[in-house]
């Protein structure tokens, strides 16, 4: 049965590292849909309402659903732009949906970003400009990672949650 895991949060919070760790752990049968790859690399789209990455992300997730894959949707996915698409995916996958949000302080995201290999790609000033505080979906099943949650703790939590659905 297909399962959907949505991992959201501000730039530099650890979403990509977590999603890649999940994909490595589960291996074949896992579809990782990274917002940066779809929006920026594949389509060269801007972050704006109606951008083509919304439909492509949904289509890829539907492919995963049709093929009974574990679908990992990872990215910033600002609610004012992406909430309708995420709601449709939630409806499609039903109770096989898990959603997580990195609810970190700005200072923690900067600290995490400074440990990354790609830290030169954008600055703390860029991060501040893009920052959206507590951009929650408002779903009952949405869970949160806080400053004190390590990559390993977040990973273990999702693995345990997946075993329950």
Question: What annotation goes with each model-predicted range?
Answer:
Residues 13:
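ATP-binding Walker
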Residues 16:
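Walker A/P-loop
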Residues 10:
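P-loop (Walker A) phosphate-binding loop of NTP-binding proteins
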Residues 52-94:
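Glycine-rich phosphate-binding loop used to anchor ATP phosphates in small-molecule kinases
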Residues 20-66:
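Conserved substrate/cofactor phosphate-moiety recognition/catalytic segment
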Residues 115-159, 165:
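Small-molecule kinase domains that catalyze NTP-dependent phosphoryl transfer to phosphate-bearing small molecules
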Residues 7:
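Hydrophobic anchor at the beta1->P-loop junction of P-loop NTPases
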Residues 93-112:
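Conserved phosphate-donor/acceptor-positioning beta-strand/loop module used by diverse small-molecule
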């Amino acid at each position: 049965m297909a399962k959907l895991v949505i991992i959201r949060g501000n730039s530099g919070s650890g979403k990509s590292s977590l999603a890649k760790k999940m994909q490595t752990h589960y291996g074949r049968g896992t579809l990782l849909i990274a917002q940066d790859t779809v929006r920026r690399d594949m389509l060269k789209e801007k972050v704006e309402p109606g951008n083509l990455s919304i439909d492509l992300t949904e289509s890829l997730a539907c492919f995963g659903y049709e093929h009974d894959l574990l679908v990992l949707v990872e990215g910033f996915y600002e609610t004012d732009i992406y909430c309708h698409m995420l709601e449709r995916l939630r409806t499609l996958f039903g109770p096989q949906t898990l959603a997580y949000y990195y609810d970190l302080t700005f200072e923690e995201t900067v600290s995490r970003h400074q440990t990354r290999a790609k830290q030169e790609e954008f600055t703390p000033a860029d991060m501040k400009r893009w920052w959206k505080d507590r951009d929650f979906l408002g779903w009952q099943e949405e869970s949160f990672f806080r400053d004190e949650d390590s990559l390993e703790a977040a990973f273990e939590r999702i693995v345990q949650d997946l075993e329950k659905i």
